[in-house]
Amino acid sequence: VCVKGENIEHYGTPEEVFTDGFVDQLYEITDGTFQEKSGCVELKKCGGIPEVFVIAGNGTGSFLFRQLQRNGIPFAVGILGKNDIDYPAAEALAVQVIAAEAYQDFERQHYEAAKQVMCACRKVICCQTVFGSQNVLNRQLFQEAEDCGMEIELWQK
């Protein structure tokens, strides 16, 4: 049962109640979003052109995304799978996210899109310490940033 004020607003199973956007509507959340997939409330994303490009994944970036948002720094994230644990926070907080469909390999088009966004940023922050075989294009992005002489920060929480 979901109560708003003194009235029952909605009732049913969690799957019926917690649909995309329902919690935002129920509690009139306007300066952020409730992420149904993660159960987290995220603040409003920073607007503007991304200043920082973040290479993250597997839970390495969510804390950094929130820190950048709190500091008012617009950022982009790539390349993430839509099933990555970092994806809901990236989607909520980043100005731009370059993402592949869940359970699909990253493709050259993802790399090219991410490279274009990354090269327009002033800085790259890499949260990854290991690049596996399914993450080879993110390793190439990191190498591209190094080769171009971009400012790079290695970040771990």
Regions found by a protein language model. Give the residues of each.
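Conserved switch/coupling elements of ABC/ABC-like ATPase nucleotide-binding domains
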Residues: 1-16
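ABC ATPase nucleotide-binding domains
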Residues: 26-109, 126-128, 132-139, 148-157
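Short, well-structured alpha-helical segments in soluble
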Residues: 110-120
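Short, conserved loop/helix-junction motifs that constitute active-site signature segments
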Residues: 118, 144-146
